[in-house]
Amino acid sequence: AASDVYKRQGVDHDHLAIPSLLAVAALETYLVRTRKNTAISLIIETAEPCEVHHFATLLGFGASAVNPYLALDSLYDMINRGLVDKDYSQASKAYIDALVSGIVKIASKMGISTIQSYQGSKIFEALGISESVMNEYFPDTVSRVGGIDLDDIAKRSMTMHESAFDPNDLGMDEGLRSVGWHKERSNQEEHLYNPETIHLLQQATWRDDYNLFKQYTSCVNAEDRHITLRSTLDFKFAEDGGIPMEEVESVESIMRRFKTGAMSYGSISQEAHECMAIAMNRIGGKSNSGEGGEDLERIVTAGSAVDKCSAIKQVASGRFGVTSKYLTSAKEIQIKMAQGAKPGEGGHLPAKKVYPWIAKTRHSTPGVALISPPPHHDIYSIEDLAQLIYDLKNANKKARISVKLVSEAGVGTIAAGVAKAGAGVILISGYDGGTGAAPGSSIHNAGLPWELGLAETHQTLIQNNLRSKVVIEADGKMMSGRDVVIAAMLGAEEYGFATAPLVTMGCVMMRVCNLDTCPVGVATQNPELRKRFHGKPEYVINFMRFMAQEMREYMAKLGIHTVDELVGRSDLLVQKQYPAGTHESKIDMSRILTNPYAKEDSHVKMHFVPEDVYDFKLDKTIDETVIIPEMKEALAKKQKKEISINVRNLNRSL
C-alpha cells in the first residue's frame, strides 16, 4: 500500500496552515468516495496535536500515523532548560506511552479492541459545527445544533497565524499563556463557576440572603455569557403579565422534586455526605448515596429528627457496599449505566482515598484503588436490564427503580427500552457533571449537554406512547432557577444538583478531589483536613429553597401554575436572535425545541402519570404466593424451616 504524508511545513509569514484534522478528514473522505482508502495510508506531520483527544480524533478520522513534531521538540527544549529531569529518549517514551494509554482508554470505552478498528471509525459527535462542513468533510458524523462554517474556521486559523506572524511587523510577545481551560485564569477561558459566582453563592446561602442569590444567578445568566446551549434560549412570557405568585405551586412542593447528585462516600467526606442527606431529608427531596455504599449507623437513623439515610441508593457495576439492608432502606434505587462527565468509564476511587473506614463500608481492602468496570457484566441487553430492575424491585417493593443514562445521540431509543423494561425514573446526565477522578480528556471531550439528551428522550418517549410511564430526571451543572425551568420545558420532572451543594458547603474548586488534599474537608478522607469542614444542612436547604423560589418567579411570568403544567412546554421557548455572522447566530436549536405534538392534542400525555406506572405483578411471584406463606410462622418465631417447591424458568426471581 502507498503512503501519503501530509506536512504542515512551509508555514511562514505569507502561508497559512490548514487545521490538521480538517485536512485529514477531507483526504480520508475523498479516498473513501473514490474507493482508494484501502490502498493508501495517511501519515500526518503536524505541530497541532499535543493532547490525547487531538490524536484520538486524527486517528478516528483516518490518519494511520501522526508525527507531533512540535510536542517532541518542546520536550527537547524543556530538557535543555532543565525543566524535565530525564533524557530525551526517556521523556519522549513517557509522553508517547501516555498518549497510547489514553487512546487505548478511549477505544475501550467504545468497545473497540484494536487500533486498526478504531482508525477511520468516526465515532464522534460534533458540537457547534455546521452541517455543511460536516457533510462535506466529516460525513456520517452527527452535528445536531449547527455552528461555525468553513469561513469561521479560516478566520480562526488566520487569527492564530497572526499571533505568530505579526502582520504589522511589530514586536511579538513570545511568552506562552495559560488559557485557563481546566483552572480559572483571568480574562481567559470562561467558567460558570468562577471566583465571583462561587463567592456570591456561598455568601447567599450562608447568610440566607435571597437578594445575594439573585446577584449570583444574574452572573450565571448574563446575556453576554454563551457557555451553554440553554443560554441561547429565551422565554415566551405571557402577554398579559402572567399570574400572581400566590397561584404558583409552593416552594415546599417544588423542592420535593430536587435531588443531590450521586457522590459516593469515599469520593467526598463523611461530613459532606451526611450534610447533604440531612438537608434533603428535611425538605422532602432525595440525596443520592453514590456507588460507595452506606454505613448501617446512618441507615438506622431513617425517619428520625436527624435523618442521615440517603433516599437514593445507587447500584453500579462494582456493586460496592450493596447489601440487602442497603437496598431495603432506599426510597429509590438507581442503576448507574454511565456517568455524565465520563461516559464509557466506570467509577474510580484512588487508592489513597480508600481508608479503612471506607473499605469497611465498601467491603473492600484499604489502600487498594476501587474501579467499577465500564459495563455491568450482567447487562448486555435491554432484557438483562429488565431482569436487574425486576430483581431490585423484588428486593424493595416500595422503591422506585431509576436508570442513569448519559446525554448522547440515540439516547432516546435506549430510554424507550428502559421504560419498557420497567424503570420508574430515567435520568439523563449531562457532560457538565463534575467528577474528581476522571481523566482530563474525558472531562473536556466526553459526553454532551443535557439539553440534547433530555429533549431527545422526552420526544422519543412521547412518540412511542411511553412518556406517562416514567419520570424523567436531568442533571449536569444546573446553577439557577432559569436552568431548571428550561429543563422542565424540555421534558424533565425532577432535577439533580451536585456541584452547587458542594459549593454551598465550602467547596472552592481547587480541583484536587482525586488527590485527597481538599483544603476545606469536602472531598477528602484525611482526618485532619476533614476538621476544616464547616458546611451545614441549612446552607444546602437555602440553596434548594432559593432555586424553587426563582423557578416560581419564571412560572408566574409564563402563566404556569404547577411544574406538571410546565413539563414539555418547549413551545414557550424561543431561540435568541443574534447579529448575523456571529457564532451564536449559526446555532440552530430547532431540533431541541421540536414538540412532537401540539399543546391542543389533549390525548397526548406530556408527563408522568402515576396510574400508568409499570406493573411488575409482584403479588403473583413465587415469593408472595408460596415461599412467604409457607415460612410465615417460622419467620415469626425466628425458626428454621425447610420447604420443597418447584421452580420454573417463569419464576424470574425468588
Regions found by a protein language model. Name each.
Residues 2-6:
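Short, small-residue-biased leader/transition segments that mark boundaries at the very start
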Residues 24-30, 37, 52-86, 93, ...:
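Flexible glycine/proline-rich, aromatic-decorated loop/lid segments
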Residues 8, 58, 114, 280, ...:
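Conserved, mostly hydrophobic/aromatic
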Residues 7-15, 37, 254-260, 343, ...:
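Gly-rich Lys/Arg/Thr-decorated short loops/hinges at beta-loop-alpha junctions or inter-strand turns
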Residues 12-24, 28, 366-380, 414-463, ...:
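Glycine/Thr-rich beta-alpha phosphate-binding loop at enzyme active sites
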Residues 90, 94-97, 101, 105-108, ...:
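Conserved, well-structured core domains of diverse proteins
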Residues 40-52, 291, 404-410, 468-482:
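Glycine-rich beta-to-alpha transition loops that act as phosphate-gripper elements at the mouths
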Residues 49-61, 410-421, 479-492:
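Catalytic cores of alpha/beta
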